[in-house]
Amino acid sequence: MAHNKRLKAARASVDSTKFYPLTEAVALAKTNARAKFDETIEISLNLGIDPRHADQMVRGLVSLPNGTGKTLRVGVFARGPKAEEAKAAGADVVGAEDLAELVQNGTIEFDRCIATPDMMALVGRLGKILGPRGLMPNPKLGTVTMDVKGAVTAAKSGQIEFRAEKAGIIHAGIGKASFDADKLVENIRALVDAIQKAKPTGAKGTYLQKAALSSSMGPGMRLDVSSLTV
């Protein structure tokens, strides 16, 4: 009952006809994060693309300046010195054939997967398992690399992956409700900047079409898209 009252009050505070400036929306999302846990602040962006065309896919990595507030588990496929480098950098699980066997058996204890180039013949066999989960290492995303230390450090320090879904929408968690409002704004603008830079050459018309912001359990607010960039 208390939860329903909180949700009702949160919904009542949002004007569904308004396009909120980013700073106002962030402040309201923080206020409406009334759950007993530290809610994630989430943004969705509708892009003017057609992801059915290979040349209009939007995908990339961005390091949020203030992190996400979430501990990311990192798995690394590597051998020898590179495996040791991964462990020293803080990777949660490191291995080769042994790690591949765990994945094949359904034990996936990581949220980001990194591999050295020489491991891709092995990792490629796991594509049907890792691919649908968005975990397949990709050289374009910097997750197939010899710089294992750099990739692990980036993942652990607030780097997130963004990817447009079939309808051309990107969803991302950009921090916790406990973050200062200005830190959330900085994170959102870093994400939007990265998405702008990833604009496909084949995309026509308005690229950033719509945007909405909410906390995990709170109501969504439509955003004034022009306020998303500095």
From Swiss-Prot:
GO cellular component, one term: cytosolic large ribosomal subunit
InterPro entries on file: Ribosom_uL1_bac-type, Ribosomal_uL1, Ribosomal_uL1-like, Ribosomal_uL1/biogenesis, Ribosomal_uL1_3-a/b-sand, Ribosomal_uL1_CS
Gene3D superfamilies found in the cross-reference section: 3.30.190.20, 3.40.50.790
An annotated GO BP: translation
Subunit structure: Part of the 50S ribosomal subunit.
NCBIfam families documented for this protein: rplA_bact (TIGR01169)
Protein's name according to its UniProt entry: Large ribosomal subunit protein uL1
UniProt organism field: Granulibacter bethesdensis (strain ATCC BAA-1260 / CGDNIH1)
Gene name as annotated: rplA
